Swiss-Prot record:
CDD domains: nuc_hydro_IU_UC_XIUA. The active site is at 233. Belongs to the IUNH family. RihC subfamily. One of its GO terms (cellular component) is cytosol. Hydrolyzes both purine and pyrimidine ribonucleosides with a broad-substrate specificity. Gene3D superfamilies: Ribonucleoside hydrolase-like. NCBIfam families: PRK10768.1. Its EC number is 3.2.-.-. The lineage of its organism: Bacteria, Pseudomonadati, Pseudomonadota, Gammaproteobacteria, Enterobacterales. InterPro entries: I/U_nuclsd_hydro_CS (IPR015910), Inosine/uridine_hydrolase_dom (IPR001910), IUNH (IPR023186), Nucleosid_hydro_RihC_nonspecif (IPR022976), Ribo_hydro-like (IPR036452). This is Non-specific ribonucleoside hydrolase RihC.
Amino acid sequence: MRLPIFLDTDPGIDDAVAIAAAIFTPELDLQLMTTVAGNVSVEKTTRNALQLLHFWNVDIPLAQGAAVPLVRAPRDAASVHGESGMAGYDFVEHNRQPLGIPAFLAIRDALMRAPEPVTLVAIGPLTNIALLLSQCPECKPYIRRLVIMGGSAGRGNCTPNAEFNIAADPEAAACVFRSGIEIVMCGLDVTNQAILTPDYLATLPELNRTGKMLHALFSHYRSGSMQSGLRMHDLCAIAWLVRPELFTLKPCFVAVETQGEFTSGTTVVDIDGCLGKPANVQVALDLNVKGFQQWVAEVLALVP
């Protein structure tokens, strides 16, 4: 039986690979997509998501979400993904439009209609998820779990300690981590290992139409290089859904620092139980890299 999922995303070049996997992995049933400001503005992430849906000719409802963090000024990662968020490929024009309601309400409505609890997957800042949990707490029983790409048990990637998706809206992340829902965190501890090799990247143009598109995007992606390998951060959240045995997880208490002058956005992961608080997150700490790479190759071979 396919696993029903909703995907909250901020495309983003590596988001494009994660979206492809979410759509075409046979074990998954992607029923709703929502966008959030993150890698670039929400107008651009929405445009990029709609372009991808049109590229693959799939009809999945998509709702535009939060344009700004809960309480602070927005930040982006255009230096990594390009000003458009998906620089490097010329998508054809289309007339697709997002749903006419905010993302968190679209998630609420879809959860309440679903015949069984749904897995939420968030691969951008957690603003939409925080709005859902704070404004619609009645939805919690309908959430099977939340799988996120974000955070770190060690170093960061946009500050010395903070990972971008959490640092972009620390207050939202803190709200989500305090919510009591089941959370799986695929942070930099595993995503920095999730590298596609130069040899594999070189095969993409001959793989299929999607391979050509991704190869063009990857040539503009700044999370590594085509010569040294590229990190597939967001794809780890999708991989865990279908190949959890590739990941080493540990239940930990995790809090989000929202006040520190140098540490704002840090996920404080109590690996050794020093704080004596009950675990609230399953934290991914290690990855079977070869198994991950093999899975990616299998999935992308299925994509048209």
